[in-house]
Amino acid sequence: KDADSLLQQQFPSCHNLLADLIDNNLLLKTKYSFDEENIDSVVFSYQRISDFIIAREIVNKFQDWESFAENINTDKTLHSIFVDKHWSFKGILEAMAILIPERFAHEMTDVIRFIPEDEYERVYYTCLNTISEAQINSLCWRAIESIDKETIIQFLGSKYCHINPDDWYNKLVELSTIPNHSFNADYFHALMMGLTMPKRDSIFQFFFNDCAEYDNDRCANPLRRLIDWAWSEDVSVKADSESTRLAAIILCWLLSSTYIKHRDEATKALVNLLSEQVEVLIETLRQFENVDDMYIYERLYAVAYGVALRTSSRDGLMKLARYVYETIFKRNSPPKNILLRDYARNIVEY
């Protein structure tokens, strides 16, 4: 009745609008349990759109960040979404994680300090889990300029963050090929280069070995999707150079995997991805010149040799050969790794 009355007020000339929207599957008629009573209700068929519209209406009620945050405990709707029934409003929380930074220039996780300690104890695991997941999931959908990188990094290192490390690494792979994103492959590369090889392997080997596959439902994990995309036909011609560069960085780090199947898959994917983008290959080689893992450096030169054999660019091949000669042989102190030297020699001779 309420939905029908509202539509009649807004669109008085459309007498059967509610029925038409339901018939066309834009709205869905359902039963909603409220105070042990089943009530007929109408919801959006497209849940993400519904969540976004609801979140926008809630956020727009407040003039600034202070009024929004301070009402977390006094506004019934906000308290229900963030605390009491947060598990029922994950989609709305995720939409709020997109809207709050754009409207108030604050990350949604800043609301945590407004939750009283007694409330915090009561909802420690569940509430913070839901807010943390919504915050991380929102990064795929947000305007790049609205992301406060330092605030998010501080949150990730705080006691309030309840995110499984593999979930965060999967999210970084999802974001990796987005140009200019705060958490794209350049961020991942800086993170990895800042660690020693033993530390890196202790943190990431399980992720690389487990998350470069399909899950139990045969859905590809983000790293597997990246491999499959890099293997696709004509990808080296169709992909823009910046997305190619970012994808190559992630695949290069997969070369450190102790699982030879994944190293081989990453090697072949890189050859296919870079075969017509030799300048991107050279830039990638430069980025990994100081890597302390010979697994990666050796395989990168295997990739370079594969690209040299496949590329149709004579000019690109000359640039690659010149780079390899100047980097490996010019100073008369080539690396001790015999396979790496052999790949490099074959590139120059070819």
Feature-to-residue mapping (PLM):
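C-terminal leucine-rich, beta-strand-based interaction scaffolds used for sensing/assembly
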Residues: 3-161, 197, 212-216
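Alpha-helical solenoid scaffolds in eukaryotic proteins
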Residues: 74-76, 95, 107-110, 190, ...
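Long alpha-helical HEAT/HEAT-like repeat alpha-solenoid scaffolds in very large eukaryotic proteins
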Residues: 281-350
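Alpha-solenoid repeat scaffolds
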Residues: 28, 60, 64, 88-89, ...
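HEAT/armadillo-like alpha-solenoid scaffolds in large eukaryotic assembly and transport factors
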Residues: 6, 107-113, 141, 236-239, ...
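Extended alpha-helical scaffold segments
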Residues: 121-256, 265, 308-309, 321-327, ...
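Solenoid-like repeat scaffolds
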Residues: 71, 77-81, 112-118, 195-197, ...
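Extended amphipathic alpha-helical scaffold segments
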Residues: 235-295, 299
